[in-house]
């Protein structure tokens, strides 16, 4: 015979709900994105440690490259060394500010603050899926 919801005690229902949640990883480590190492060559800006930055934030370099193109309004490309080359001269302050904004919007989970997220593109929107709490947040694509 199956039990109805009102046959359960509150504690039993609460325990059942908790058992359905994904495992929560508690990490005390601090999340620090490396500061961009910027160098100017003629009228171009090179981000020397671009590959290292994308590895730390766990994002495809092409996505961060597209973000820079949209925000700065200039062409950009990656060389074989994993450096990003932007047309135009941009200070390290501007570059680091954009990286911080990208991380805040497209990496950090707005629900639990975890950095363990995946960015999934569906049509014209991104979905930020948190691997720690399971939350999904819809974001505007760029």
From Swiss-Prot:
Lineage: superkingdom: Archaea
UniProt keyword annotations, A-Z: Initiation factor, Protein biosynthesis
Gene Ontology MF annotations: translation initiation factor activity
Gene3D superfamilies: 3.30.30.170
Entry-linked SUPFAM superfamilies: Translation initiation factor 2 beta, aIF2beta, N-terminal domain, Zinc-binding domain of translation initiation factor 2 beta
The keyword Protein biosynthesis is annotated on this UniProt entry: yes
Keyword Protein biosynthesis: yes
Residues annotated as transmembrane: none
The protein's assembly and partners: Heterotrimer composed of an alpha, a beta and a gamma chain.
Family affiliation: Belongs to the eIF-2-beta/eIF-5 family.
NCBIfam families in alphabetical order: aIF-2beta, PRK03988.1
Function: eIF-2 functions in the early steps of protein synthesis by forming a ternary complex with GTP and initiator tRNA.
Protein name from the UniProt record: Translation initiation factor 2 subunit beta
Species: Staphylothermus marinus (strain ATCC 43588 / DSM 3639 / JCM 9404 / F1)
Lineage: Archaea, Thermoproteota, Thermoprotei, Desulfurococcales, Desulfurococcaceae
Gene behind this protein: eif2b
């Amino acid at each position: 015979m199956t039990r109805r919801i009102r046959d359960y005690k509150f504690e039993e229902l609460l325990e059942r709900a908790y058992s359905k949640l994904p495992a929560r990883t508690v990490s005390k480590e601090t999340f620090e994105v490396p500061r961009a190492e910027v160098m100017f060559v003629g009228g171009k800006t090179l981000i020397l440690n671009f590959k290292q930055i994308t590895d730390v934030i766990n994002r495809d370099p092409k996505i961060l490259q597209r973000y820079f193109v949209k925000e700065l309004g200039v062409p950009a490309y990656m060389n074989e060394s994993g450096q990003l080359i932007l047309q135009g001269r941009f200070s390290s302050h501007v570059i680091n500010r954009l990286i911080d904004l990208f991380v805040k919007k497209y990496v950090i989970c707005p629900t639990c603050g975890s950095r363990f997220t995946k960015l999934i593109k569906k049509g014209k929107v991104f979905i930020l899926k948190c691997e720690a709490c399971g939350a999904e947040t819809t974001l505007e694509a760029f």
